[in-house]
Design a protein with these regions (language model features):
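Hydrophobic alpha-helical segments within soluble ligand-binding/sensing domains
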Residues: 118-148, 188-196, 215, 255-274
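Amphipathic helical "hinge" segments at domain boundaries
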Residues: 8-76, 85, 163
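Short beta-strand elements in bilobed, periplasmic/extracellular small-molecule ligand-binding domains
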Residues: 51-67, 147, 162, 166-191
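Flexible loop/turn connectors
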Residues: 195-315
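N-terminal helix-turn-helix DNA-binding module of bacterial transcription factors
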Residues: 1-20, 306-316
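An alpha-beta-alpha
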Residues: 133-176, 280-294
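Flexible loop/hinge segments that line or gate small-molecule binding clefts
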Residues: 90-129, 213, 239-251
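Periplasmic-binding protein-like
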Residues: 27-29, 79-91, 146-149, 201-214, ...
Length: 316
């Protein structure tokens, strides 16, 4: 990668095989500033280790996508003033990834709404598995199912997993609306407010959550209010985390092998370092793990417990 002066695009030139490659400065652009989200993604640590072993320098950018409001203009200004030879964008929105696909510095989409965008990418193929998990819940008698996902996965139109979820609900003849895919403020306070509103009157019998930290937060919320899992409500997480191995009952979740994703990014960086254009997109197989956090929907004559219910008298 050769610089051509300030304000001019960098030139990608393929290096001869006998020429030693220089290490690249690789920036990771997180979707959130929350440290425990990266803690759940142990494969990021493995990826950084592999890249640094290969002689590259890796770092997390000072700002996250959410801190920049997932706003293309703000992100563009931030990125262009950050010195990096390659960018790895974690869970970017469609407009953000579209901008990176046209940016002069090589960029890689790790997850995110990348479908139809000419950008190198990798991630698990979750939509079919999300559909399977939804069908399983419906087969267990669940009619009131809520999926909690980030704004980029529900707006301006539902993303792959949310779309698969809504399709299965429609196929089952269940009417859908904001109860199934609610809008919410993406913060601790917003998450609690959403759960309180869901359980105030006619609560869901099953909740599908986007990320592991949300799953744990939901479990804590429900436990402190006497709402039992899975007797009163079933929970499914659309991701996996090392912490799930310590959970009893076992967590119903979507599992995928991160090793192919790590290998793909290492190969991409190697190609970038050699000056080879690489915009290949790969999907990793995912599968639904039926854990102990899901069960049959509460019987029609047995009222779901709400946050106003008395734990000593309801939900038998």
């Amino acid at each position: 990668i050769l610089g051509q002066g300030k304000g001019r695009k960098r030139l990608i030139v393929e290096a001869p095989e006998n020429v030693a490659r220089q290490g690249l400065r690789i920036a990771f652009l997180k979707d959130s500033a929350l440290p425990y989200e990266i803690g759940d993604m142990s494969y990021i640590l493995e990826l950084r280790h592999r890249l640094e072993e290969a002689g590259h320098t890796t770092f997390f950018s000072e700002k996250s996508l959410k801190e920049l409001g997932m706003d293309v203009g703000r992100i563009a200004a931030f990125v262009t003033h950050t010195e990096a030879d390659a960018w790895i964008i974690i869970a970017g929105s469609h407009p953000v990834l579209e901008w990176f696909s046209k940016y002069s510095t090589p960029s890689f989409a790790l997850f995110g709404r990348r479908k139809g965008i000419p950008i190198a990418s990798a991630g698990p193929d979750k939509p079919p598995v999300c559909g399977s998990a939804t069908r399983h819940l419906i087969a267990l008698g669940h009619q009131r199912i809520t999926m909690i996902v980030q704004k980029q996965h529900r707006s301006p139109k539902p993303g792959g997993s949310a779309e698969a979820f809504l399709k299965e609900i429609k196929t089952a003849g269940i009417s859908s609306g904001t109860f199934n895919l609610p809008d919410w403020e993406e913060s601790k306070e917003g998450f609690v407010a959403l759960l309180e509103s869901l359980f105030e009157h006619t609560p869901p019998t099953a909740i599908i959550l986007d990320e592991a930290f949300q799953f744990h937060a939901a479990v804590y919320f429900l436990a402190t209010r006497g709402i039992r899992i899975p007797k009163d409500v079933s929970l499914v997480c659309m991701d996996s985390a090392p912490s799930f191995a310590w959970c009893e009952p076992s967590v119903a979740h979507i599992h995928w092998d991160a090793r192919p994703v790590v290998r793909r990014i290492v190969r991409w960086i190697d190609n970038v370092a050699r000056g080879k254009e690489d915009k290949r997109q790969t999907l990793t197989k995912a599968k639904f793990i039926e854990g102990g956090t899901i069960g049959a929907a509460p019987k029609a004559n047995s009222r779901n417990r709400t946050i106003n219910s008395d734990p000593t008298t309801s939900g038998h």
